Amino acid sequence: MGRSSWRLVFAAGAGLALALEALPWLMRWLLAGRRPRREVLFFPSQVTCTEALLQAPGLPPGPSGCPCSLPHSESSLSRLLRALLAARSSLELCLFAFSSPQLGRAVQLLHQRGVRVRVITDCDYMALNGSQIGLLRKAGIQVRHDQDLGYMHHKFAIVDKKVLITGSLNWTTQAIQNNRENVLIMEDTEYVRLFLEEFERIWEEFDPTKYSFFPQKHRGH
């Protein structure tokens, strides 16, 4: 190899080293320039087919995936499902009531994909007919509930410790299809931190090893 060839090799190596050194800075710059997610959903949701989302996460819904007669279009429910199904590592759910079959299937899909799912719920409402909590527990998902006098009335989810989903919506078919409700989906480090701290505080408080053996629980409205 001649002297000029060695110079080319040296220059290429130096260029590669500089590129690798600049890569972390470039990634930080790109991430800093990306707008954080801000999305507001309003309910009641249009009734649409969600089978394509629930059978093949990440694919857009379409008539080829399901022969049903429901519209195969975007809706508030499908957008909420997409936000949940974007989870790759963790999902924290803190929900007063959870009886929506579609949302229940989405949570089970995430569990099957290896996402760590933890659920906090209200002990009275988890026992109601149609609740998804029993199915989630049967699937091996960790669930904790309250044992005190007040309702566990929170309604929020945290996706990958980065995205907060919260609002007035109970995760029930009644609320999704009939009620005037709202859901905010947002990436905000400070808000996510505060909600995650609240989740961890309640998770520790609802540790079943700390329950009294004969709880005295009486609730009013």
From Swiss-Prot:
Task: Outline which residue ranges sit on the Cytoplasmic face.
Answer: 28-221
Membrane topology, as annotated, equals: Single-pass membrane protein
EC numbers, comma separated = 3.1.4.-
- Record's Gene Ontology CC terms? endoplasmic reticulum membrane; Golgi apparatus; mitochondrial outer membrane; nuclear membrane; plasma membrane
Please describe the organ and tissue distribution of this protein's expression: Predominantly expressed in testis (at protein level) and in growing ovary. Also expressed in the brain, eye and urinary bladder (at protein level), but its levels were low or undetectable in other organs.
**Record topology, Mitochondrial intermembrane segments:** 1-4
Query: Which residue ranges are recorded for the region named Required for mitochondrial localization?
Result: 1-38
Question: Membrane-crossing residues?
Answer: 5-27
User: What is the protein named?
Assistant: Mitochondrial cardiolipin hydrolase
- The species this protein was found in: Mus musculus (Mouse)
Which gene underlies this protein?
A: Pld6
